[in-house]
């Protein structure tokens, strides 16, 4: 009776811990999404600090450096301790907005200080965001898609939430905006230091998987062949160690117990450790020293195992394939997010639309809202959809990436639609800006689906041990791709710009070539992902038939 009561008490405590970690992770994610707020305060900041607008592209690239390139460092810290990562992230964001506030208040014309602040904002934000996603994916292994969708979607929604609050509360007072962001975002990310936890039973689900994966990675480039898209469900041989005092373990989750029984892969543990001799003169201190030594060795072994697992994963063809897929779609999405304002301006400057009383700032603000809102919807809906695909149809989460690639293809084709044949300027303007708005919605939703699904794909494929490090490396692909796509767009605008006032006045011709390139890239991505799905399906069938 006492044991049953203790188990019940432990279960309630465990549920509370999961809930606290989940809620805290969502608060952290909401506070960490302010890199997308740059366009809200950038014009006033540059004007106040007497920095030319031409430097804005370099400043926005500083955000990308902090959130993507330095994301590798953030991932390593998260894998060590999500709490520590949130503490570091909170300090970085606090210091960054403090520096921006001082630059704005004292009119310091220092591109270096502002760039440094933006790097800190990018790094601090992903430090908190990666920690929240890691805890969601690890603590809820049977519902990774749904659990991970909440912090991912709130991160995408954060920009719209804070831009609305700042505009309502402070209006044009950017100095107060920086103070508000410094306190609010810093404190929200700091919540993770007190709430985020990785529960041992969830990590334990992946422990034997990691050992099997490391053993298998020496035999084949594909480290691991999952039975379904869930990192706890694997077909494989038990890990055999050269040490006589080790366990042989199979890792199969409860919800696929029937499958494990069908293949005669029942969970079991075998130990050949020698029994203590009755005459052995051991005291309780001997056992304590022995346990302490074993714990130390176990921790060192776990760290070494994680590093080896990450290294083997980085070399795998699957990881390289994921890097290409994510890099292309991430680059297209970020290019559109950073550049949609220029597309609106090109339409406004094109005759005869330049004769109409069009509020370009309002249309640009609408695009930001659509991108943020639809990105939130995509991130939130993609998780449950991918879970449904896995559990109901035993399909792969990569089908969501097929949908995202298809949406990017359609939006890239639609944005280049030319309405110059319409003679009525008002009708032409209405059609043109409606077309851009629809494309913003499509691009936003596809971007949300991409980042709402890919964290679960990575966790399913490579496990949660070393997950944040791998995710940090994966997101670096966007740094290079967005640089390429924005360079193509810049050349496209330059080729169609006259010498009079520096504005492109040729409508969709200002950017049509760029989106022809993105259309072909999306088509390649679509076929490439279908190839990965087909190859993975073939490997599973071959593995199942060989048992």
Curated annotation (Swiss-Prot):
Q: Where can this protein be found?
A: Membrane
A single Gene Ontology molecular function, please? transmembrane transporter activity
List, alphabetically, the GO terms of the cellular component aspect: fungal-type vacuole; fungal-type vacuole membrane
Matching Pfam families, A to Z?
MFS_1
- Tell me what organism the protein belongs to: Saccharomyces cerevisiae (strain ATCC 204508 / S288c) (Baker's yeast)
Highest taxon of the source?
Answer: Eukaryota
Instruction: Identify the residue ranges that face the Cytoplasmic compartment according to the record.
Output: 43-58, 105-110, 166-175, 345-398, 459-469, 536-547
Q: What is this protein called?
A: Uncharacterized membrane protein YMR155W
Region: Disordered; residue ranges are 275-300
The membrane topology noted for this protein in its Swiss-Prot or TrEMBL record is: Multi-pass membrane protein
Question: Membrane spanning segments where?
Answer: 22-42, 59-79, 84-104, 111-131, 145-165, 176-196, 324-344, 399-419, 438-458, 470-490, 515-535
């Amino acid at each position: 009776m006492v044991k049953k009561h203790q188990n019940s008490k432990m279960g309630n405590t465990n549920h509370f811990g999961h809930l606290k970690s989940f809620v805290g992770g969502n608060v952290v994610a909401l506070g960490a999404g302010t890199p997308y707020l740059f366009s809200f305060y950038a014009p006033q900041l540059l004007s106040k600090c007497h920095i030319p607008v031409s430097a804005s592209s370099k400043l926005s690239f500083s955000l990308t450096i902090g959130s993507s390139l330095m994301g590798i460092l953030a991932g390593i810290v998260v894998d060590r301790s999500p709490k520590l990562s949130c503490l570091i992230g909170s300090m970085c964001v606090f210091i960054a907005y403090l520096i921006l506030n001082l630059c704005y208040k004292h009119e310091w014309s220092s591109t270096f200080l502002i760039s440094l602040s933006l790097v800190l904002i990018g790094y601090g934000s992903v430090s908190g965001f990666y920690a929240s996603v890691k805890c969601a994916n690890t603590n809820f292994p049977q519902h990774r898609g749904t659990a991970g969708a909440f912090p991912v979607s709130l991160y995408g929604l954060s920009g719209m939430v804070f831009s609305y609050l700042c505009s309502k509360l402070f209006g044009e007072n950017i100095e107060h905006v920086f103070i508000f962001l410094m306190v609010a975002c810093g404190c929200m990310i700091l919540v993770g230091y007190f709430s985020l936890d990785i529960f041992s039973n969830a990590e334990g689900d992946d422990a034997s998987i990691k050992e099997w994966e490391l053993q298998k990675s020496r035999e084949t480039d594909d480290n691991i062949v999952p039975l379904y898209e869930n990192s706890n469900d694997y077909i494989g041989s038990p890990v055999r160690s050269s040490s006589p005092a080790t366990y042989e373990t199979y890792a199969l989750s409860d919800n696929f117990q029937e499958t494990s029984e069908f293949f005669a892969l029942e969970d079991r543990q075998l130990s050949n450790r020698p029994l203590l001799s009755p005459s052995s003169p051991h005291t309780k201190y001997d056992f304590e020293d022995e346990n302490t030594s074993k714990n130390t060795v176990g921790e060192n072994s776990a760290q070494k195992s994680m590093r080896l697992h990450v290294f083997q994963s980085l070399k795998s063809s699957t990881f390289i394939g994921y890097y290409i897929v994510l890099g292309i779609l991430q680059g297209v999405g970020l290019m559109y997010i950073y550049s949609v304002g220029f597309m609106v301006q090109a339409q406004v400057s094109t005759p005869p639309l330049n004769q109409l009383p069009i509020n370009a700032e309002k249309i640009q603000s609408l695009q930001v809202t659509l991108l943020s809102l639809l990105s939130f919807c995509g991130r939130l809906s993609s998780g449950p959809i991918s879970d449904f695909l896995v559990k109901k149809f035993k399909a792969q989460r990569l089908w969501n990436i097929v949908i995202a690639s298809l949406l990017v293809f359609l939006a890239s084709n639609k944005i280049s639609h030319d309405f110059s044949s319409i003679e009525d300027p008002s009708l032409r303007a209405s059609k043109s800006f409606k077309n851009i708005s629809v494309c913003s919605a499509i691009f936003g939703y596809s971007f949300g689906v991409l980042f709402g699904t890919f964290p679960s794909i990575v966790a399913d494929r490579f496990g949660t041990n070393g997950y944040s490090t791998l995710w940090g490396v994966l997101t670096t692909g966007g740094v290079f791709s967005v640089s390429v796509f924005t360079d193509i767009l810049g050349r496209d605008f330059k080729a169609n710009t006259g010498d009079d006032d520096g504005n492109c006045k040729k409508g969709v011709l200002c950017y049509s070539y760029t989106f022809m390139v993105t259309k072909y890239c999306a088509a390649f991505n679509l076929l490439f992902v279908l190839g990965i799905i087909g190859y993975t399906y073939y490997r599973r069938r071959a593995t199942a038939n060989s048992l």
